[in-house]
Amino acid sequence: RKEPVTAGLILLNILVFLIVEFTGSSQNTMHMLDCGAAFTPMIIQGGEYYRLFTCMFLHFGIEHLLNNMLVLFVLGSRLEQVIGKIKFLLIYLIGGVLGNVISLLIELRTQDFAVSAGASGAVFAVMGAMIYIVIRNKDGWVICL
């Protein structure tokens, strides 16, 4: 396979989802917290900063998982081919964590806390990188999906 990181991330997300479902339910907020979902009070007051990373691999229900993985498959496969495995993985992981940090900062400002999970921040980072590449190369590069 030409896109091992994309495939690996998709498989990892599916595996984590199956483990969550076999040990409880991805629709159960308490179970998701036990599995590493993000919740600002636990991160800040409890010092559980790992949640900014672990929540990227958790999803609330099969639709949530499938939507994120579909976009990751379509855009991630092509982006990984263009920029390489290491850069792609860094964009995905750093983008996901930064997205979660931004959510945390917004929640601290608004004092409106919610349990959160999902790869959306990472997937949006992949989208952003793809858009950047298209804009930078608009005169001589076409993305064939």
Give the residues covered by each predicted segment.
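A detector for small-residue-rich transmembrane helices and their helix-helix packing motifs
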Residues: 1-145
